[in-house]
Amino acid sequence: MKKAKRNPLLARLAGRLELTLDVRSDAAALPPPALIRRACQAALRRDVKQAQISIVIVDAAEGRQLNNDYRGKDYATNVLSFALNEGEPVEGLPLFGDLVLCAPVVEQEAAEQNKALMAHYAHLLVHGMLHLQGFDHEEDAEAEAMEVLETVIVKQLGYPDPYHEEHI
């Protein structure tokens, strides 16, 4: 009897984080699974004991449709975050959510902002993970706090400050 093969797109990290990856884009340059795992793990708060996150990479049409359906905005955006358990994580309960990255938008932004594409993917994964954990940037103070945290995490991953003026 043959042993069933493990799905290579499913990864467990330190018993805390389970990721699935669904690529629905034909973009040539996509973030490797190792980068996705590292960025998501780095952004996971220490008090989150378990998380199940789906990463979906889409094309512009699907990104636009999702942004329109869920946010009422008729354009494709770089990252959308969908938390199954909205807001602050509840102690003892797993964090569940989906991150949707729109590959053409990420590529365009990286080029326009003079950023390395993989650095931009890492930043957006961190940004999305923070949203799943209740962080927001609706108010100026929230935005500033979130940017500081993103910058610290992205630098820990070995990438430059995503908000530094030479990259914007």
From Swiss-Prot:
GO biological process: rRNA processing
Record carries keyword Ubl conjugation: no
Cofactor note: Binds 1 zinc ion.
One Gene Ontology term of the molecular function aspect: metalloendopeptidase activity
Signal peptide: none
Entry's localization field: Cytoplasm
InterPro entries attached to this UniProt entry: MetalPrtase_cat_dom_sf_prd, YbeY, YbeY_CS
Pfam family, one: YbeY
Binding site for Zn(2+): 127, 131, 137
Domain of life the protein comes from: Bacteria
Names of the cofactor(s): Zn(2+)
KW ATP-binding (keyword) present: no
Gene Ontology CC terms, in alphabetical order: cytoplasm
E.C. number: 3.1.-.-
UniProt keyword list: Cytoplasm, Endonuclease, Hydrolase, Metal-binding, Nuclease, Ribosome biogenesis, rRNA processing, Zinc
Primary site of residence: cytoplasm
Its job: Single strand-specific metallo-endoribonuclease involved in late-stage 70S ribosome quality control and in maturation of the 3' terminus of the 16S rRNA.
Recorded family membership: Belongs to the endoribonuclease YbeY family.
Record protein name field: Endoribonuclease YbeY
